[in-house]
Amino acid sequence: MSGRSVRAETRSRAKDDIKKVMAAIERVRRWEKKWVTVGDTSLRIFKWVPVTETKQIYKPKGAGPAVRELKGFPTDVVLENARSVLLDFQDDNSNQSFLSDAYQSNTKVDSSSNSSPQHVSEAVSPSHPPYYRTEDSQPPTLGQESMEAEREASTTSSEVTDEPPTLIKEDVLSLSTQEEEEAIGAPPLKRVCTEHNSTVS
């Protein structure tokens, strides 16, 4: 085969795969960030994956437990097709950004078409604790990182003053009491002496 025909075939296969993924994304409306193992390796990445309880999403509101169908197809067949397509693309590193971008564009479309912003925020927000703790084994999500950065910025801006710290009488007294404790035999406290450093160097 010539190089052009191979490239054309690859391009058409890629387009077909993209169409399958886009169709699956349209069916799956709830996504969450999870740690996913890549292929047979021990490499794990943190990426958007569809929520596994998809049968609840496809349940029609008016229908009972009788036969459920979606556009003429049984729901189970549609779910299996969507799962198989998504599983094909979950292990590829190259598709991580594609799925993420596709999800972000879907949320923009959903938020512009929905009249209730509360429903959109419920579907988009991951089910993580509101704050990242150091004992957690997973890193925070993007929203949590920005909240922490804003919180830290607000605390540092409130602590920062325009004037440099000044030495007041209480500080002088505390220095003299420290010297007395050293003379008594108490363990010395660590302090920084700027005058001593400037004379040595």
From Swiss-Prot:
Superkingdom, natural source: Eukaryota
Region (Disordered): 104-201
Pfam family, one: BCL_N
InterPro entries cross-referenced by the UniProt entry: BCL7
Family: Belongs to the BCL7 family.
PANTHER family documented for this protein: B-CELL CLL_LYMPHOMA 7 PROTEIN FAMILY MEMBER B (PTHR12767:SF5), BCL7 RELATED (PTHR12767)
Listed name of the protein: B-cell CLL/lymphoma 7 protein family member B-B
Source organism of the structure: Danio rerio
Source species taxonomy: Eukaryota, Metazoa, Chordata, Craniata, Vertebrata
